[in-house]
């Protein structure tokens, strides 16, 4: 149960906690009041964002997905997400608090479904990829204990810590350190020069707020085991949320044999986090430990000028060739009330710090690169009013030359991409992608990155582009390697400085010889099994099978991927790029005739039956990761615009003869549609169930022609993240994605919404984003949460018992669950660990004592409409036969069927699942093909 920290009086007065005991009219008034307050939070949020965007102008685009997710997960009471609760939950999971006590027949059957073989609990999911895509990476380190110089550690922003034992080989696989790390946001990694077996990993990404951190993790055995240090229990103090959420950098200095650990802590980024209680504001600053991280002391000299008790938000820490400590800063969440950004400090003794540069731009983010041969020489890259600036010093910061000097002696790189401004090679994203590093052997050679990578051989006086993110916008004629956009890290191999690694939004890239970049293969991807891809969603092709698979998945900055074919030796599927940029939601026809895929906002496309690709809608309205649905029966596409209005396109089975229009579910009251689900039980028209971000459920009938909408009364307030159906249109499962002590995130109705049952049970306080009910055993339900897959075997109980069924996937955000009944395949899309499936290979897929499948036979299969079932009539008198289509809807039923008795169907071509029942007992299930 969620821990209630309020007093009993407060609980009694709480609308969410108390409304269920009110009279229907009083409850309705309470819910309306609660929704009104939530809409006010949304309005406040929108106003805050407009202010932030105005401050940045068009120079720095907002991180739209994180803004969207912030709204969808906020506590309705406080107006802010409560990520820090996941830290306590992780501790509970580690202690085994939510370990399953029984297997679910819904999931992969490894040792049988009778509950006696507990292995089914431990490995229900199979990793499917992508195998060579990667994802956003800010932390890379060559293992100092590997004399070959081949072993590398790297951290995904939301995919945990990984190791590759031979980075020089394109076939060498990355291995996750542990599923424990899977929801850990890695921002930095370093080792102790006095004891190279000791590593420190900083967590949390303040640049986007995409993933909250959990302090610092330490290992003393080269990465085999880890302990958590420098963690402050999160708590509120007024509007300030305290905690070490963002450890941007960790470095270790050898001071005459004493290991001094420096940790750079930042508050949340103002350009992304908003209305969030000033997350980590008071903990920002530079910290130092001399006892292995047992204790840390804040260095008070690095404080904002407005408040000596408020530390600067630290961006980077570097140890110079003379053992001096350099520190750069970044913007503070407190904005003008804390002039944090644009500063560089230096200390020769690790105690007394001198400010050696101040851009007097409080919002500036500063990255540094120090010479390994000249302790007084450094290069700096920062966001500024230009909007980016490069600086250089050769005297320890006493004087600087800069690209904004009246007569500059150093210059900015200019990208060959005509879509990137000549004065901003970060393309307005200096808050996000920014890195500069000199060569460790020759410090006149400098590397820098924004969107693409550049090299200077004359101390930043001039630059040459050495990578390109695409062949668009004039880039095709540039001889350079194709390297993913958005650069975050540049690292040299200490054993061979000609070898380099680059970290970006596409993962890890490797250069074997940095003396020659005049080649399309000078820099190559090293993402083999580096599966840290962040998927917004994924959809199975309903007519495929695990041995001839196809599904589409849309990823953050890695486009839409197509998984296809049979499993490889490692169980991954072959993956190809289906569409670039940010891939969003996808859909399939129930007969596999067309595919729907998406870019951001209302940019939706279709692969038609003739194999050609067409645009369904191409407008920049709607959500960044926009909501869509397809009625596979009526072949109609729907997507949200704003409020309760939607796009509609009919005729999806045609080749570009689509009829497009706009429909509405009524007048919104400051809220919007957050989920569209198509009822599989209405077959002659479209019936939609629409969820809103205030907790409303709207039923829209005749959505494909002349819509009529009815609001279904609900007892919940929050963002409706998923709507699924049980055995009929009256059985509706709903999830909400908000944090909140009094939030209930799972609901069920079996009477079409006349009454609702709270199915929260013992579920911890965390967002729930997806849900699915076992069609053959409704007591089993799984959900996709912020901490992996959870499930229950007693959903029908008043208070279900939930457990984590997420081994392999780990504690990773699950954004969508899809299901293919014909093969009993589940697909889980994760935000940080790629795509996973679970297929129950036991055709019974239920716990029973009936005969095995050898006692049954369906023929002919495939069929053209007539089916026969053969079985031993001595064991079973007459059977009741049902057929279900790919959506799980029952489409055929016949009772009292004898062995070898003909059953004539008029079903369309496709895959179906046949279920044979002896009374109330399911005795046989099998896929059937009608053609």
Predicted feature locations:
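Short, solvent-exposed secondary-structure boundary motifs
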Residues: 569, 575-576, 844-852, 894
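Generic detector of low-complexity/intrinsically disordered segments
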Residues: 15-18, 24, 218, 288, ...
């Amino acid at each position: 149960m969620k821990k209630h920290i309020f007093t009993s009086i407060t609980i009694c007065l709480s609308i969410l906690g108390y409304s269920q005991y009110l009279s229907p009219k009083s409850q309705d008034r309470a819910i309306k009041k609660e929704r009104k307050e939530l809409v006010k939070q949304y309005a406040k949020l929108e106003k805050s964002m407009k202010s932030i965007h105005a401050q940045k102008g068009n120079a720095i685009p907002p991180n739209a997905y994180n803004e969207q997710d912030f709204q969808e997960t906020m506590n309705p009471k406080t107006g802010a997400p409560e990520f820090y609760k996941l830290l306590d939950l992780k501790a509970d999971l580690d202690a085994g608090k939510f370990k399953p006590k029984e297997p679910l027949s819904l999931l992969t059957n490894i040792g049988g479904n009778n509950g006696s073989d507990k292995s089914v609990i431990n490995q229900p999911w199979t990793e499917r990829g992508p195998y060579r895509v990667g994802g956003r990476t800010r932390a890379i380190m060559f293992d100092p204990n590997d004399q070959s110089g081949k072993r590398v550690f790297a951290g995904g922003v939301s995919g945990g810590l990984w190791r590759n034992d031979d980075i020089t080989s394109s076939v060498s696989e990355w291995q996750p350190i542990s599923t424990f790390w899977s929801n850990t946001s890695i921002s930095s990694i370093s080792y102790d020069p006095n004891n190279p077996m000791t590593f420190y990993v900083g967590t949390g990404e303040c640049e986007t707020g995409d993933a909250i951190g959990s302090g610092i993790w330490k290992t003393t055995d080269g990465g085999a085991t880890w302990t958590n240090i420098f963690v402050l229990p999160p708590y509120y103090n007024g509007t300030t949320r305290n905690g070490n959420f963002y450890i941007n950098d960790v470095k270790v200095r050898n001071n005459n044999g004493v290991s001094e650990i420096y940790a750079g802590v930042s508050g949340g980024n103002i350009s992304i986090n908003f209305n969030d209680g000033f997350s980590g504001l008071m903990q920002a600053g530079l910290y130092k430990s001399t006892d292995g991280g047992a204790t840390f002391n804040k260095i008070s000299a690095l404080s904002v000028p407005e408040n000596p008790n408020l530390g600067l938000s630290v961006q980077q820490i570097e140890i110079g060739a003379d053992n001096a400590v350099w520190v750069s800063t970044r913007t503070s969440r407190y904005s003008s009330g804390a002039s944090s950004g644009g500063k560089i400090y230096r200390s020769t003794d690790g105690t007394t710090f001198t400010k050696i540069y101040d851009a007097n731009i409080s919002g500036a983010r500063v990255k540094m690169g120090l010479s390994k041969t000249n302790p007084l020489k450094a290069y700096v890259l920062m966001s500024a009013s230009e909007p980016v600036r490069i600086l250089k010093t050769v005297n320890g910061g006493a004087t600087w030359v800069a690209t904004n000097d009246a007569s500059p002696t150093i210059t900015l790189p200019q990208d060959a991409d005509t879509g990137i401004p000549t004065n901003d090679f970060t393309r307005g994203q200096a808050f996000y992608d920014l890195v500069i590093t000199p060569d460790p052997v020759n410090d006149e050679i400098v590397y820098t990155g924004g969107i693409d990578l550049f090299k200077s051989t004359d101390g930043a006086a001039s630059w040459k582009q050495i990578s390109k993110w695409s062949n668009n916008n004039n880039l095709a004629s540039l001889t350079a390697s194709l390297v993913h956009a958005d650069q975050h890290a540049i690292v040299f191999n200490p054993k061979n400085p000609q070898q380099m690694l680059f970290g970006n939004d596409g993962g890890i890239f490797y250069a074997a010889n940095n003396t020659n970049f005049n080649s399309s293969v000078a820099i190559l991807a090293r993402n083999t099994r580096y599966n840290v891809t962040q998927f917004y969603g994924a959809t199975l092709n309903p007519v495929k099978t695990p041995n001839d698979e196809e599904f589409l998945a849309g990823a953050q900055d890695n486009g839409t991927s197509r998984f296809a074919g049979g499993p490889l030796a490692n169980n991954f599927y072959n993956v190809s790029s289906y569409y670039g940029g940010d891939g969003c939601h996808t859909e399939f026809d129930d007969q596999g005739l067309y595919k729907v895929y998406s870019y951001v906002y209302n940019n939706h496309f279709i692969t038609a039956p003739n194999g050609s690709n067409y645009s369904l809608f191409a407008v920049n309205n709607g959500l960044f990761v926009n909501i869509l649905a397809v009625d596979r029966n009526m072949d109609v596409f729907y997507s949200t615009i704003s409020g309760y209005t939607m796009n509609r396109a009919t005729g999806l089975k045609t080749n570009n003869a689509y009829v497009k229009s706009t429909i509405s579910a009524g007048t919104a009251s400051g809220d919007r549609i957050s989920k569209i689900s198509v009822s599989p039980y209405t077959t002659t028209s479209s019936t939609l169930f629409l969820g809103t971000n205030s907790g409303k459920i709207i039923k829209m009938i005749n959505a494909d022609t002349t819509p009529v909408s009815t609001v279904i009364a609900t007892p919940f307030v929050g963002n409706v993240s998923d709507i699924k159906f049980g055995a009929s249109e009256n059985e509706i499962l709903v999830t909400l994605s908000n944090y909140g002590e009094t939030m209930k995130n799972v609901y069920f109705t079996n009477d079409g919404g006349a009454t609702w049952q709270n199915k929260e049970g013992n579920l911890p306080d965390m967002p729930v984003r997806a849900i699915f009910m076992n069609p053959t055993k409704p007591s089993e339900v799984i959900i996709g949460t912020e901490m992996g897959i959870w499930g229950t075997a007693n959903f029908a109980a008043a208070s279900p018992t939930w457990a984590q069924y997420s081994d392999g996937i780990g504690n990773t955000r699950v954004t969508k669950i899809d299901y293919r009944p014909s093969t009993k395949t589940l697909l889980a899309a994760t935000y940080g660990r790629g795509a996973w499936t679970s297929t129950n290979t036991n055709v019974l897929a239920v716990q029973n004592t009936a005969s095995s499948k050898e006692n049954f036979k369906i023929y002919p299969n495939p069929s053209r409409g007539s089916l026969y079932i053969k079985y031993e009539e001595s064991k079973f008198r007459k059977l009741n036969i049902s057929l279900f289509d790919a959506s799980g809807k029952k489409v055929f039923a016949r009772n009292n069927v004898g062995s070898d008795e003909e059953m004539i169907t008029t079903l369309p071509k496709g895959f179906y699942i046949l279920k044979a029942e002896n009374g109330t007992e399911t005795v046989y299930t099998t896929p059937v093909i009608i053609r």
